[in-house]
Curated annotation (Swiss-Prot):
Pathway membership, UniProt: Nucleotide-sugar biosynthesis; CMP-3-deoxy-D-manno-octulosonate biosynthesis; CMP-3-deoxy-D-manno-octulosonate from 3-deoxy-D-manno-octulosonate and CTP: step 1/1; Bacterial outer membrane biogenesis; lipopolysaccharide biosynthesis
Keywords: Cytoplasm, Lipopolysaccharide biosynthesis, Nucleotidyltransferase, Transferase
Lineage: Bacteria, Pseudomonadati, Pseudomonadota, Gammaproteobacteria, Chromatiales
A cellular component annotation (GO) from this entry: cytosol
GO BP term (any one): CMP-keto-3-deoxy-D-manno-octulosonic acid biosynthetic process
CDD domains (alphabetical): CMP-KDO-Synthetase
The keyword Nucleus appears for this protein: no
Known role: Activates KDO (a required 8-carbon sugar) for incorporation into bacterial lipopolysaccharide in Gram-negative bacteria.
Provenance organism: Nitrosococcus oceani (strain ATCC 19707 / BCRC 17464 / JCM 30415 / NCIMB 11848 / C-107)
Protein known as: 3-deoxy-manno-octulosonate cytidylyltransferase
Length: 259
């Protein structure tokens, strides 16, 4: 199917400054993400940034760059400007691949695009994977999602949701809940160009500000986000220095196994 990938990238990450250009196995992390997007079969892959250092490195590797405003407070707003600059037709499917997901399987990019196409009432399509341990469930850097019976998002949170009161009570020894499946949100989104053009007009929501999760703006204003279970489980992205070292080790292992 036909879709385009836009990778928003900013240099000034608070926890890992210069994150898109940090070295992973001899190349900037952002270029690993670009390569994954290219392997997905997207008809076009471009990077949207406000930083000339990122622009220079990406262009030197033959990748299209869209320079955007330094005023954007979210990756989605950056994508919205890129879509406006490119003047894509309204029904064009745009995939937002986060610049800190260097190990994202290309098949998941295609899955998100296909999921949006098959759910015409959804404003956004995204993916999730099961959470299998307490460390992930209680990690605020890992975003959790609760879905309704049709797979549409009810809420995203950095907290463990839903709160299994009986299982998490101290008297039970904080046992793992057996009556509910927990899901981790995977950091990519599929939109139609028409929705991205409307998105900047939505006021920032208090939920979005509280959780620092821009997808909550859509839910707050009545939008619908379909969340499919990913066909394969990707490693978490890079949010911290510990994540960076973990990904470096995974890449070393992959290279060793390949040889």
């Amino acid at each position: 199917m036909s879709y385009k990938v836009i990778i928003p990238a900013r240099y000034g990450a608070s926890r890992l400054p210069g994150k898109p250009l940090l070295d992973l196995a001899g190349k900037p992390m952002l270029l690993h993400v670009v390569e994954k997007a290219q392997k997905s079969g997207a008809e076009e892959v471009l990077v949207a940034t406000d930083d000339r250092r990122i622009e220079a490195i990406v262009q030197n590797h033959g990748v299209q760059v869209c320079m955007t405003s330094v005023q954007h407070d979210s990756g989605t707003n950056r994508l919205a400007e890129a879509v406006t600059q490119k003047d894509y037709p309204d029904q064009t499917i745009i995939i937002n691949v986060q610049g800190d997901e260097p190990l994202l399987p290309p098949s998941l990019i295609t899955q998100a695009a296909e999921d949006l196409k098959t759910h015409p009432k959804a404003d956004i399509a995204t993916l999730c994977v099961p959470i299998a341990n307490r460390e992930e469930l209680f990690d605020p850097n890992i975003v959790k999602v609760v879905r309704d019976i049709q797979g549409y998002a009810l809420y995203f949170s950095r907290a463990p949701i839903p709160w299994a009161r009986e299982d998490f009570a101290a008297k039970t020894g904080n046992r793992w809940p057996t009556s509910w499946s927990y899901y981790r949100h995977v950091g990519l989104y599929a939109y139609r160009a028409s929705f991205l053009r409307r998105y900047p007009q939505l006021p920032v929501s208090p939920l979005e500000q509280a959780e620092c999760l821009e997808q909550l703006r859509v839910l707050y204003h009545g939008g619908r986000i379909h969340v499919a279970i990913a066909g394969t489980i990707p490693p978490p992205g890079v949010d911290t220095l510990a994540d960076l070292e973990r990904v470096r080790q995974l890449l070393v292992t992959q290279e060793r196994n390949h040889n």
